[in-house]
Amino acid sequence: MGTWILFACLLGAAYSMPLPPHPGHPGYINFSYEVLTPLKWYQNMLRYPYPSYGYEPVGGWLHHQIIPVVSQQSPQNHALQPHHHNPMVPAQQPVVPQQPMMPVPGQHSMTPIQHHQPNLPLPAQQSFQPQPIQPQPHQPLQPQPPVHPIQRLPPQPPLPPIFPMQPLPPVLPDLPLEAWPATDKTKREEVD
């Protein structure tokens, strides 16, 4: 529909311009500010008001969408802990089987995540009791899985190599090296 409106505006503007009375006259149709300014205004109206940087709005919105959904699930798991600690507990459940290297992301984490670690063993134990029936052997790992859901988004760029990656051709082809000229011991530089 927008293209039809634009077409109608341009068609009306073309018919409103005076055409030369006879073919020898050098008549030019001046598409100046009278036509181009409303056209630019119309094109700006069609665009989104936000800049189209694909990663900024999506990354920010994904973080905000995950936390409310998890906080709605968190009162079902354990209602005694604050909501800041519970959003990490449901996110641990799919992550624990995937990541055996949880101490490494814990070392890269920020200090707010370290504040979550002392408070999470109780909700984490209660949330893990239905799935694995061995909560006590996993107690050292339970403070570390909350670190991983926050670190889960940065490790996703290494995940796309699951698809078969073709090795890039070398920039310089591998050519056999030519033999170096023999050096005399008298002309060789001294190396200390």
Swiss-Prot record:
Residues 108-117 have a biased composition (Polar residues). Pfam families: Amelogenin (PF02948). Residues 87-105 have a biased composition (Low complexity). One of its GO terms (molecular function) is structural constituent of tooth enamel. Residues 132-173 have a biased composition (Pro residues). It comes from the Eukaryota. The keyword Signal applies. The keyword Repeat applies. GO terms for cellular component: collagen-containing extracellular matrix; extracellular region. Keywords: Biomineralization, Extracellular matrix, Repeat, Secreted, Signal. Belongs to the amelogenin family. This is Amelogenin, Y isoform. It comes from Bos taurus. The gene is AMELY.
